[in-house]
Structure formats: structure tokens, C-alpha cells
Amino acid sequence: MQEEQYSPHRWVIQAMLMLLQVGMGLNFMSPTPLFPVIMDEFEISRSAVSLLVSATIIVITVALLPGGLLIAKMGSRRSMTVAGVLMSAHLLTPLTDSFILLVIIRLVFGMGVAIAIPATSAIIMEWFKPSELPLLNGITESGRSLGVAVGVFVAVPVTNLIGWEMTLLSFGVLPLIGAFVWMMGGRSNVSSTTLEPPFSIRDNIPFMLNGNTLLLAAGMAGAFAVFIGFSSWLPAYYNEVRGIPLERASLVVALLPLMAAVLNPVSGLIQSRLGKRKPMLTMAGLTLPVFALGSFLVPSQIIATVCVMCLGAIFSIFIVAALTIPMELPGVKSSSVGLVTAAVLTMGNFAGVVSPIFVGSLTDFLGSYTVPFCIIALVPLTLVIAGLFLPETGKRATNGIPKPATS
């Protein structure tokens, strides 16, 4: 049974998943370097244009738990196909003639993401060995980060050639291709799922609401606040305050997800060998604020750019640990890991909703980015709390056995 469960076909499954992860990332942050263009097009404020990110994350936040339930009931294979189709919503961008319609398109995309993220966790847990989970989470997150980096890198140059509407349309093609490929070749691991008892919402509520889940969720919120808030507004800050051309400013900020994309697999491999998760969370919580502050406070743009790159590197360490911990909690199965992951990500995404709106609105009010950036930069300290009080779930936990989750 074990040989069948962990067959070599799992790497084909991972390759198909990667296409969808890159497509997700490509569309997720691609509107952010285009904020000035979209603001001029629709004559809207910074706080309004922030909705293109915040509204997306709102629907992700609201839909994550229902998405986890959908996966448990419908199966990971069909759920991932639906997710890919929804994530291709940017194909409709040229049909929009108002900002409201553009926001609606982003909401549909967010629904797809809310299904795809927990479905990905469920599929990985179905197909891969426990010792491979950190590495696979690193590879998967690398695909998302690579997509984000490419989207932020090329959005402005492509817009200069074909316009922002056609740029977003072209980005919407990849998730649709990924959905088609997955529909043709993707499948659930029957040998894994048939070993589990029937899914019960009541049995899984303790996993979603226990103290460990809430601690990890609080840490997730801190890291997401910095990643999304700074990715959204640093291009505009560099352009407006430091006079850097928007295209170059976007390239600088794109180094954040690019570093994460490059280092996520390395982080996964190291954490597979290390066998510990708590030190990763604590270290990330202590260093993210330092590099976030450096990205806009230091006068040297070279040093600020290095800080942006370091933000991406530290985020790669955090995200691999944060996505692996739910898979290692005692009693969590492939049918329920989507729900646990969704519960953790819900708070993280809520912070992602608030962060860009907070920065945009407070900047409009104060006429300066400094205060909102400083506040957001300190939020990742919640990771230190999570790192201190979470039990160790890695293979090198006390006596080699993960500590049980506490209610």
C-alpha cells in the first residue's frame, strides 16, 4: 500500500500543480505596479485603487473555510479544476468599462485562490511522504512567488506595449491552461484517501479553533501584512517620493517575490533536514521588521533594494514552516488539512486586506508614507509570539514525537 501511495506519479502531479501555482501568483499582485495608471484611468484615490488587492484578499479570507469544506466534500481533483477556471477571470478585463467591474473580476479571481490554496495542501499531503512535505511546500510556494515576481516585473513594460487591459488579459491565460491540463491529467491519490474515515465537519472543528491554529494564524497575519502592504505600495513610494521611474521601481519591488521564488525550495530542503519549525518562525519575526524598515527609511537606494531582497529571503523561510506545521499536527489527515490551512490563512489574509488599505488611506490623510509603513513593518513581531508558544511539530520534536495540539 505504501509503495502505491508514494508512487513516482506524484512528481507528475506536482508538475501540473506548479502550472496552477505560477498562474495564481502571476495574477495575484500584477495590478499593483499599474496602480498609477489605473488611478488616472478611472480618476480614483489611492485608498480606492487599493481595493484591487484588498477586495481580492477579502474574498479569499471569507471563502477559505467554505473552500476547505468544498474540497472535503467534492474532492481535491474537481476542486482544483474549478479553482483554475475562476483564477483565469482576468481574461474578462477588456470587457470592463468601470472600476467596479474590475473589482468584481478580482473578486472572482480571489474565489479561485481560496479554493486552490487548501486544495494544493490536500493534494500534496495525499501524494507525498511526510519527510517530503517541507520540500514540496517550498517548491509549491516557489511557483506562486515566481508568478508574483514575473507579474510585477513585466506588468509595466507589457502595458507600455499593449495597454493595461490586455496585459491583465494575457496573465489570465495561464491559469486557464493550468485548469485544462489538470482536468486532463490530475487525480486524487485513491490509496491515500480510502484509508481515511468519512469526512465530518464536527470532528474537524477542534483542529480549526484550537490554540495552536490561532497562534500560527496570528503569526501568518504579521508576515502577510508586510508582504502584501509593502508589495502594494513600495513601487508608488519609490516613484512619488524618490523620483524613481515607475518601471524601475516595480522591478525593485519584484525582487521581493523573486527572492522568495528562488529560495523557497532551498528553504524547504533545509527545513526537511533540520526537522524543526519553531526557530524559523521566531527568526522571521525578528528580522522582517528590520528589513521592512530599511526598505524605505535608509537614504541609499542600493541598501533599500538589498532590504527588499532580504524581505523575500526571510519570507521564504517563514512560509515553508507555516504551511508545513498544519500538515504535521497530530490527527490531521489529507481530507482535513485543507480546513486547517484555510483557518490559518484566514487571519493572514485578513491582515492582507487591511494592510494596503491602511497604508493608502493613512498616506492620503497624512500626505506621507512614513508612519503607515513604520506601523506595518512592526506587525510581524506576532511571529515571535507564535515561535515561542507553539509546540514543535517537526521530526526533531521532544522524544522524536510531535507534541499534541492543545485546545
Predicted regions and their residues:
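Cytoplasmic membrane-interface "Motif A"-like loop-to-helix N-cap segments
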Residues: K73-A83, S272-G285
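A late C-terminal transmembrane helix in Major Facilitator Superfamily
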Residues: K333-L366
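C-terminal transmembrane helical hairpin of 12-TM major facilitator-type secondary transporters
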Residues: R277-A322
